Amino acid sequence: YDSVVVVENLKGGELQATGTGFIFKKSDNKYYVMTNYHVINGASSVKIQLTNNKELNVEVLGGDSYSDIAILAFESKDDYSIAEIGSSTDARVGDTTFAVGAPVDSTTYSWSVTRGIVSGKDRMVKVSTSSQTSSSDYIMKVLQTDAAINSGNSGGPLCNSNGQVIGITNMKLVSNSTSNIEGMGFAIPIEDAIDFANKIINGEDITRPTLGVSMLDISSTGLAYYNISVPDNVTNGVVIMSVSKGSAAEEGGLKKGDVILEIDNVKVTSSALLKYELYRHNIGDEITLKINRNGFEKTLKIKLTK
């Protein structure tokens, strides 16, 4: 509980937004804090507030929108609580969970604890990686919980009944005009977050492979706008709109108008899913694409580049 902090996103000295984070590691006199990237995105400076109400300036070591993880650091000779890391893999559906955070108004409701269960595992949820648009362009594999999660909880720990962190709360589904939704919150599995955090702490570049194409989902209304037709028997996949010169796609033989049906035997249902599968690979890996070109299926091998 005492390892949880309020994260303050400041721009020009003015508070823009608040979220939650937690101290997860200490090395010598350096403490490391984990939070969501979207909590600190756009900040010119970041502060954290501890459970003893002490406020500290922190350094942003790194992060990115696809992992939605950011790592902060500060130096201190004082002793602060460090969260115990658990296992999302060992968590079972129905297990008790606790979310700790600073929902809604961090000045009033900081360090609120809510209780729920693990409602599901390995949920594939579409997300937007840009604050400029709400359209989904990526997919995250997450834990599902019915523990109450509200604005401001983002970046806080989702814990098991032993108080060990099994995930980082990062989003919830909300009601709209067509559906009434309650108790559907999500958390990034702690194993994924720690793996990313260690890369940041070790000074590794966070680079992701690229095909070097622009694309549209087959279901997109944009295909009609660009006067692009696909074979009637092709109902899933993404259409290649353009191929960059010198790109991995061009080297591997992808052409404008090709429809990507599968990547490494995984059926491609959207460009968001294709990107998710692509980013599971490293630069230099070879992938296998099944495509439809002018009504005929074809298999291509492509070596991934930056």
Question: What name fits each language-model region?
Answer:
Residues 28-68, 74-79:
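Catalytic-histidine neighborhood of serine endopeptidases
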Residues 13-15, 43-46, 80, 100-115, ...:
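Active-site loop architecture of trypsin-fold serine endopeptidases
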Residues 1-26, 33, 44-45, 69, ...:
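N-terminal activation segment of mature serine protease catalytic domains
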Residues 7, 45-52, 99-101, 285-291:
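Short conserved beta-strand and strand-loop elements enriched in small hydrophobics
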Residues 5-7, 21, 31-35, 58, ...:
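Terminal peptide-recognition signature
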